[in-house]
Amino acid sequence: MMITSTNPMVYTNPVVYTDFPDPDIIRVGDVYYMATTTMHFTPGCDILRSYDLVHWEFIAHALNIVADTPEERLECEGANAYGRGMWAPSLRYHRGTWYVLFAANDTHTSYLLTADDPCGPWRKRELDGFYHDSGLFFDDDDRAYVVYGQSTLRITELNPELSGPMPGGLDRVIAQDDPQADLGYEGSHLYKHDGRYYVFTCHFPQGKGKTEACLIAESLDGAFEAREIIDDDLSFHGYGVAQGGMVDTPDGDWYAFMMQDRGGVGRVPTLMPMRFGEDGFPVIGENGKVPHSVSVPAASCAEPVAPINGSEFIARHNAEGGVDANCLQPYWQFNHITHDEYWSLTERPGAFRLHSGRISSNLNHAWNTLTQRTMGPVTVAEVTVDASTLHDGDFAGLAAFQGCYSYIALTRRNGRTMLTVQYKPVNDDSIFSDDDWDSPAVTDAEIMADADCMRLRAVYDFTDCKDEVTFFYRDADMPESEWRPLGTAHRMVFKMDHFTGCRIGLFLYSTKETGGIADFYDFAYSTPNTKEGGR
């Protein structure tokens, strides 16, 4: 997409209708940059670029892996990093260097990523101390601080090397949320504007939805005054818009950016105009209400903006026209650390190939599951799966990948190829997990496959929290044949087990013996009836 607007354009919230949780947005020159949480997916720590705060493109994954641990590598049953990994990045640019600070709950470590160019390469190092939901801040005198915590918010000065706390430096509690709050302050960002210090933070006051608060002080060692600045759900089922910060335009206008839980699709970015009241506190949207439509600043970009989702596997070719091995489009991410000997883009030209390298009880433990974000309100994914080299007990197919997963897959049983829909049952609609990672999937429907090579389809419908996926199939050699449904609709429920929106997943796993192979090709991604304001 080419961005060449000369006049402000109006878009619908959420402006990006896909799972970009914990967004942090900054402006450098005329360009906006965003970092977002990627949890257990690799490569991680997505860095995106925009010229208008609405149309975003990937420019880097700042993080290859969090840590080379059995959990991050899915090395054994019961050991995983689901819902943990890379959390809540804080993105900053200061004196020629780019910074991302984040914490990982599985390693209980904070990490600092640095780069000379936001497109990379990025360097990683550990910090002394653990800074939950941290916000990095550089003051006018170049001293660095971090605001962090859950319920109790602290500000700690960092040493000049940014390797840990400054000996004798500022280290203080700035706020303590109401102990009766359903969830205390977290997701904090620290700014300075007109000589005042601003902390944006979110919480769940007792008996209310998620809201955004702002704390203001005249100095970092002074008293912070708190005020609610957003208490609104965009008329969407009580899901509060909160957790984010503020960014200005080159013309001096201000916007607040926040995420909103949107059920199965995940946590999505919203955008709203902002101004400062006479008392200095931000005034968000329309008297604290998030507008359904937002006018964004004019932008001009000479280069096309790359899509944030799509149908291609391969990102680039080499000078000879061949494929650069292991070079996927940036909208693809693997579940956990990859086992590179068991996947390929080159063994079968045009196909993504998976080899079975371990015995797994279910999809949770499959190595190298390749994922892509879904997008609201509806996403359709199609792929052709060649199962001619599966072994008995292998499953290869197309998933609605989340804690309570479901999928359509080809499987081999007693030398015959079957087509099956399986799922992990949803016990309730709460966000809490049952922590059952190991039980086999439940079969919803199963038939004899017409052939070893089948075209599979999944329709992910998030319309008004419908949050259902349905599966279809047809013969891969008969592209004009009608799609035939298989099984029933399955719920896509956002839970804290994965703590991410439902993703498309291409997978292979074995329940009896390793060595099977599955090829995936002619993948197609579409978003029918999607309105502008996202993509």
Label the model's feature ranges.
Residues 1-535:
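Carbohydrate-active catalytic/glycan-binding domains of CAZyme proteins
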